[in-house]
Swiss-Prot record:
SUPFAM superfamilies: Bet v1-like (SSF55961), ISP domain (SSF50022). It comes from the Bacteria. This is 3-ketosteroid-9-alpha-monooxygenase, oxygenase component. The keyword Iron-sulfur applies. Pfam families: KshA_C, Rieske. Induction: By 4-androstene-3,17-dione (AD). It comes from Rhodococcus rhodochrous. [2Fe-2S] cluster binds at C61, H63, C80, H83. The keyword Iron applies. Its cofactor is [2Fe-2S] cluster; Fe cation.
Length: 382
């Protein structure tokens, strides 16, 4: 009897990744109101003080468990809707209007925050360490330039999937053909320290996807890098039959529970010469819409697949196990991070065999489509 490969689904994680996590655009939280964010297995409350500085606390009041995100901002504090206990951004209770004094132990958890290029980040570390400067999120030079648009931003709540599902895409060359309808003509990964890089060139499939809409050959040059466990910066150069666009895509997420996460994505676009600001914003919205459609294609797979710790791979599948080893550094204590997790690793996938097979498949699809169209015309003439 032949041996059967069984799927190992592994164990449920007991901690959330150490690192910077983007909660969204900073301006979202600067409207004078408290905002609820479900993350890291709990609920957070996010608001901005009178200086516009973002503050993040655990949302549940340490007095009687009221939800601070349902309260009000009073001065620089967030006031609980239950008994009006007021909490400052440092986690200390600042006032209890009906009490003679504030109990010395009236403290809640405050979260370290950072603002970069119009986005708000929080630092998560199960050990309680402060963020090392070498793992900070890099600046995006294009942001804030008159030559580039502002962020167009969206988010999707993903249920029934662990964050690692989206990380696996960093090394998944073949899914770009089957899920995103593109020929990957170049594909390379580099992992080092807390950064995982993907170098990708693609050509659109003429039988499916965006390339079929315009009848033009489309190409893409992409450099994507995860800085830590959850935040990817992805400069893109698209060419649609000679019309070129440059953009910077953000692909990021934060965990809600161990089997759900909030996927966020946003784009800034270089304004084409001769295009008005309004037209540039429309272009950015269209590109974001296209990215969203791509993510939804992934989401449909994630919703229906199983977790698999022992994937059976061929050589064109890329360094899945090496990527997961890199990713594991964010789920262990700092003292347990090993050289194998952070040491430099490079791998380029040979795409020749894959593209040869895919070219044949696409040619057959186009030929079949042509026959079906001709048959349809003949039937219409009868």
């Amino acid at each position: 009897m032949a041996q059967i490969r069984e799927i190992d689904v592994g164990e449920v994680r007991t901690r959330f990744a150490r690192g910077w996590h983007c909660l969204g655009l900073s301006r979202t939280f600067k409207d004078g109101k408290p905002h609820a964010v479900e993350a890291f297995g709990t609920k957070l409350v996010v608001w901005a003080d009178s200086n516009g500085e973002p503050k993040v606390l655990d949302a549940y009041c340490r007095h009687m468990g009221g939800d601070l995100s349902q309260g009000e901002i009073k001065g620089d504090s967030v006031a609980c809707p239950f008994h009006d206990w007021r909490w400052g951004g440092n986690g200390k209770c600042t006032d209890i209007p009906y009490a003679r004094r504030v109990p010395p132990l009236a403290r809640t958890r405050s979260w370290i925050t950072m603002e970069k290029h119009g986005q708000l980040f929080v630092w998560n570390d199960p050990e309680g360490n402060t963020p090392p400067p070498e793992v900070t999120i890099p600046e995006i030079e294009q942001y804030g330039s008159d030559e580039w648009t502002d962020w167009t931003w969206n988010q999707i709540r993903i249920e029934g999937s662990n964050c690692r599902e989206i990380i696996d895409n960093v090394v998944d060359m073949a899914h770009f053909f089957y899920i995103h309808y593109a020929f990957p003509t170049f594909f390379k990964n580099v992992f080092e320290g807390h950064i995982a890089e993907q170098y990708l060139n693609t050509r659109g499939r003429p039988d499916k996807g965006m390339a079929t809409q315009y009848g033009l050959e489309s190409t893409l040059e992409s450099y994507a890098a995860y800085y830590g466990p959850s935040y990817m910066i992805n400069p893109l150069k698209n060419n649609y039959g000679g019309y070129q666009t440059e953009s910077v895509l953000i692909n990021c997420h934060y965990p809600i529970t161990h089997d759900s996460f909030m996927l966020q994505y946003g784009i800034i676009v270089k304004k084409p010469q001769g295009m008005s600001p309004e037209q540039s914003d429309v272009l950015a919205a269209k590109l974001t819409e296209g990215v969203g459609e791509g993510f939804l294609q992934d989401v449909e797979i994630w919703k229906n697949k199983t977790k698999i710790e022992n994937p059976l791979l061929c050589e064109e599948d890329g360094p899945v196990y090496q990527l997961r080893r890199w990713y594991e550094q964010f789920y262990v204590d700092v003292a347990d991070v090993t050289e194998k997790m952070t040491g430099r690793f490079e791998f380029e996938v040979d795409t020749a065999k894959a593209n040869e097979a895919w070219e044949k498949e696409v040619a057959e699809n186009l030929e079949r489509k042509k026959r079906e169209e001709e048959q349809g015309k003949q039937e219409a003439e009868v």
